[in-house]
Curated annotation (Swiss-Prot):
Organism, as annotated: Mus musculus (Mouse)
The protein's name: Helicase-like transcription factor
Taxonomic lineage from the root: Eukaryota, Metazoa, Chordata, Craniata, Vertebrata
Tissue note: Expressed in brain, heart, kidney, liver, lung, pancreas, placenta and skeletal muscle.
Domain Helicase ATP-binding: 433-600
The enzyme's E.C. designation: 2.3.2.27, 3.6.4.-
Gene: Hltf
């Protein structure tokens, strides 16, 4: 059978319009996601702040109270110091007890019993967030005054006032002395409590002002010391570009910095936090790290590799002369299997007990002494000796095997299997001498020790016995795991010996003592999270790492996600976040990053919220200045348009984006209009009845069918019942209907958000009322609201036992069903094939990405590609890691006969891939989230691209796709101004969804 692609009416489209340049995780049970509470006698002070509505709080007023029992506790406070109020419901002397803690987590005392009796009810029922500041605290011996400020939702104001009145108290305005102290603080360099300036009297910044400040936040970083360039250690093969040398100098300066952290200064013998007025005798711990927020495609990975090899110890490189020592894996010698792997050898350092067997000569030009200076090793070595490279990986079918490693890295691979169950705890640091401190600052290992009955002293001693590790831990998404391996092989000289271990797969080595002696451990967020959730100690959490690097670090932006909690529990001397998008949705995205960097007092979410987030989002310019000062201290960001010495940071070829309008054929338009009219009538009824959100799955189903028709009528799914679950349905009928609805949502490509965490769905499950949530999120809701938990969207009763997952085999069935249908073309496929054939005629060597959210559509496109003689490859989320690597290698190959087309799913192509072999992108269907498109485009418009990049978006005229572009523009505007806009609450989110539905369906 032949296929003809002509300029006939079957592929009609209008003139192009240019609008700009520019793992396999095991299933977990319901109980897995139930919160495991330790220290039930203490309620964390930031518990109230975990609400999605935290930014809708208004100031109710202030009342004066007293802190008593000062002589019994070690915590001290200064004048005008902010303090945290924390409920202690299991206090044996007073069930209403409220602790007062200073910023460091040390207890100062308790709120006076009479006041606590009134306030405890308010805190327990989350009617208000109660915050404290001590106006005069420095010289008090027995009691001290305390101003308590109440913030809450407007609808709770009267309940709070009545509760206080019942106990003889009332709220008043914030004292002028407190307000004036704040206003004077910034002039004098001493900050007062950020909350004392009420939100309702603040001068609200306009949307344009906020947008401008957001745009400038990362781009206004003054060059000052950041223009200094530094050459990497001679172990680096690839010459660094000027902006990478600047980043290297800045990052090493940050790692070796002896400066005080932001907002700290020394006054006589004390160290003061100028924001909270807290002081300590001990010098605050330095922040050895930061955020490298360079734009996507500017070579952050190479910069990070240069830091690892250049700065091992106080400016000395990781490389030094090695002696005759045992191989770190000698104890597993009998279990060692050799196979081909990479072109880099293991390399050891004289400071560690690990070394290759026998004596290895040092690199030419390396001083004999291990105490050599950085400058002695900064020049590129003229002589190179080729020595085979060894990698250490776990053996497993899911691991990256020989065939999936880059060609440049084929060499000797030592594969170590481990059956031992030994554990060695790495050194850790107990931050404070109290259970409170352990609750908030201790590592997972410390808390588990404490839970097992060990005393705090024993816990501290046990965790401090480990030796200093040499290892850097790199955590990345699975999709870029192979890219890191490739980058090490490409950028590190072959004569350099590294102990490099990929911690991935079920047979991964779990011996923390052995892991700590490697140079580099590479793993994924999913593996880290999985280990963190296991009953035994996670080996990665048992080590105090030399350095932890988070690639695509914005992955931890959701503070409630298990993934974020797993990352925050890691112990390390130095910490780095690599991300091109540090703020994706709103200012709250930054807290997890700052918490990871261990920047006190922002480790505690309450202080972040009181000092930065709330002031900024309510338009307080002081809060904005604090945020800018903080960001400028710990962040380096350059965009593709940034300039160094008058020249662009990266001279990339131009990127052009075109919209190619498509006109549906008469048959396609008829089907489209029929489905639209039927769905429009049903949705109209939902609006009339006020049940549109209760039928949200049905609405998504309609939108999905319309989008599928725009691509190909074969994608059209079966119609769904517009009614919800019926009481007459049998359990099996109900299950089938719910699974069908869930499949529609999961296959819609909408990147649908969970209404609880407001993030993309992870471990999606569907309730009996047909709403889809993240499994961890909905399980926590059910647990906290037992026994009468209600759906967050429709308020119907829900139960953990009734949550349904979509079995992978059912999704596979749908795919098989599609492949059995007789193939035919569509208007979009005709337009694509015409463009590809025309492109091949002009230049047969040009490579293209064909991108779609629908993997079944990509399968349909394969047929005409084969018929027209195109050599192509494919990359989508259903492929195993080995297949992904092979596909990328084939596509990046420049030899004759290599694929000129890659069929790419939008999600698989959104993170970390380097596909700069392609210079043409054809986006077959628009995404709900425009950022997802931009990330995909940056896979080829990045460092290494030599040709002009042309992107073509296929959009069907007079269709839901055109309306999606309108919503995309709205989302772009919101993203640009998200820095200063208020975070949407649940009601705003619902209304936004309703408005989007009206726009999409033309209601």
């Amino acid at each position: 059978m032949s296929y003809t692609f002509t300029r006939g009416p079957v592929w009609k489209y209008s003139q192009s319009v240019q609008y700009g340049s520019h793992e396999n995780i095991p299933r977990l049970s319901y109980s897995t996601f139930l919160p495991h509470f330790e220290f039930q006698d203490i309620i964390p002070p930031d518990d109230f702040l975990t609400s999605d509505e935290e930014q809708d709080l208004v100031l109710f007023g202030t009342m004066r109270g007293q802190v008593v029992g000062l002589r019994y506790y070690t915590g001290v406070v200064n004048n005008n110091e902010m303090v945290a109020l924390q409920r202690e419901p299991n206090n044996p002397y007073d069930k209403n007890a409220i602790k007062v803690n200073n910023v460091n987590g040390n207890q100062v005392g308790h709120i006076k019993r009479e006041i606590a009796a009134a306030v405890a009810y308010i805190m327990d029922n989350k009617l208000a967030q109660v915050e404290g500041v001590v106006p005069f605290g420095a010289s008090n011996t027995f009691t001290m005054p305390l101003y308590m400020t109440f913030w809450g939702k407007e609808e709770n104001r009267n309940v709070v006032l009545e509760q206080l009145k019942k106990h003889g108290f009332k709220l008043g305005p914030t004292p002028k002395t407190l307000g004036s102290s704040l206003e004077n603080a910034w002039g004098s360099g001493r900050a007062g409590p950020s909350y004392s300036r009420p939100a309702h009297v603040a001068v609200q910044m306009t949307t344009d002002q906020l947008k401008t400040e957001f745009d400038k936040l990362f781009e206004d970083l003054k060059e000052d010391d950041r223009t200094v360039e530094m050459e990497p250690a001679e172990a680096i093969e690839t010459p660094l570009l000027p902006h990478q040398k600047q980043a290297l100098a800045w990052m090493i300066a940050r790692e070796n910095s002896k400066e005080l952290p932001p907002f700290w200064e020394q006054r006589n013998d004390l160290y003061y936090n100028t924001i909270t007025n807290f002081s300590v005798k001990e010098r605050p711990e330095n922040v050895h790290g930061g955020i490298l927020a360079d734009d996507m495609g500017l070579g952050k990975t190479l910069t990070a590799i240069a830091v690892i090899l250049t700065n091992f110890d106080d400016g000395r490189p990781l490389l030094s002369k090695r002696g005759k020592k045992n191989h770190p894996g000698k104890e597993y010698k009998d279990e060692t299997i050799k196979r081909r792997g990479s072109n880099m050898d293991k390399k050891e350092d004289g400071h560690s007990e690990s070394s290759t067997c026998g004596e290895e000569p040092s690199i030419s030009g390396t001083p004999e002494k291990s105490s050599c200076t950085l400058s002695q090793l900064s020049s590129v070595c003229p002589k190179r000796r080729k020595i085979s490279v060894q990698y250490i990986e776990s053996s497993d079918s899911e691991e990256i095997e020989t065939s999936e490693l880059p060609q440049k890295m084929k060499g000797k691979l030592k594969n170590v299997q481990l059956n031992t169950k030994s554990r060695v705890k790495g050194s850790s640091k107990v931050k404070e001498d109290s259970k409170f401190a352990l609750t908030f600052f201790a590592s997972a290992t410390q808390r588990k020790m404490l839970k097992k009955g060990m005393s705090m002293m024993e816990c501290s001693e046990a965790c401090d016995t480990g030796e200093r590790t040499r290892a850097t831990l790199i955590i990345c998404p699975l999709s870029v795991l192979s890219n890191w391996i490739d980058q090490f092989g490409q950028h590190v000289k072959s004569e350099v010996h590294l102990n490099f271990y990929v911690y991935y797969g079920p047979d991964r080595i779990r011996d923390s003592a052995w892991l700590s002696k490697q140079d580099i451990i590479l793993t994924t967020y999913n593996i880290l999270t999985h280990d963190y959730g296991t009953k035994d100690d996670s080996p990665l959490h048992s080590i105090k790492w030399l350095r932890v690097i988070l690639d695509e670090g914005h992955a931890i932006r959701n503070p409630n996600a298990q993934q974020t909690k797993a990352v925050l529990e890691l112990e390390a001397e130095r910490r780095w976040v690599l991300t091109g998008t540090p703020i994706q949705n709103s200012l709250k995205d930054l807290w997890s990053l700052l918490s990871f960097l261990k920047l006190k007092p922002f480790i505690d979410r309450e202080w972040w919220y009181r000092i930065i987030q709330r002031p900024v989002t309510t338009g307080d310019e002081g809060g904005l200045r604090r945020l800018q000062s903080l960001i400028k201290n710990i962040t380096l960001r350059r965009t593709k348009t940034s300039k160094i010495k008058g020249k662009p940071v990266l001279e990339l070829p131009e990127r052009k984006v075109f919209i190619q309008h498509i006109t549906l054929s008469e048959e396609e338009r008829k089907i489209y209009q029929s489905v639209k009219n039927e769905g429009k009538a049903a949705i109209g009824r939902y609006f009339t009845e006020g049940t549109v959100l209760a039928h949200y799955a049905d609405v998504l189903g309609l939108l999905l069918r319309l989008r599928q028709i725009c691509c190909h009528t074969h994608l059209l799914t079966n119609g769904m019942s517009s009614s919800g679950p019926s009481r007459s349905d049998t359990p099996e009928e109900l299950r089938k209907m719910l699974i069908e609805k869930m499949k529609i949502i999961l296959s819609s490509g909408s990147d649908e958000e969970c209404a609880i965490c407001l993030d993309s769905l992870t471990f999606p499950v569907i309730t009996h009322c047909a709403h889809v949530f993240c499994k961890p999120c909905i399980c926590q809701v059910i647990h906290s609201e037992q026994p009468h938990a209600k759906c967050p969207l429709c308020r119907n009763e829900i139960h953990g036992d009734n949550l349904l997952e979509c079995p992978p085999e059912e999704l596979a069935c749908d795919s098989d069903k599609e492949s059995s249908m007789e193939w035919k073309s569509s208007s979009k496929i005709n337009a694509l094939m015409h463009a590809l054939i025309e492109l091949r005629t002009k230049d047969p060597n040009i490579k293209s990405l064909v991108v779609s959210q629908f993997t079944t559509f990509l399968s349909l496109i394969e047929t005409p590609l084969k018929a027209s003689g195109f050599v192509f490859t494919r990359l989508d989320g259903s492929m195993a890691q080995k297949k992904r690597v092979e596909s990328i290698q084939r596509f990046q190959n420049t030899e004759a006969g290599s694929p000129t087309i890659m069929l790419l799913s939008l999600k698989a192509g959104g993170v970390g891939l380097n596909l700069c072999a392609a210079s043409r992108v054809f986006l077959m269907d628009p995404a709900w989230n425009p950022a997802a498109e931009d990330q995909c485009f940056d896979r080829c418009h990045r460092l290494g691209q030599k040709q002009e990049v042309i992107i073509t978006k296929f959009i069907v005229k007079d269709s839901v796709e055109e309306n999606m572009l309108k919503i995309q523009n709205t989302k772009r505007d919101l993203a640009a101004g998200a820095f200063g806009t208020k975070k949407t609450d649940a009601n705003d989110m619902k209304q936004a969804k309703i408005n989007e539905i009206r726009t999409l369906i033309d209601l």
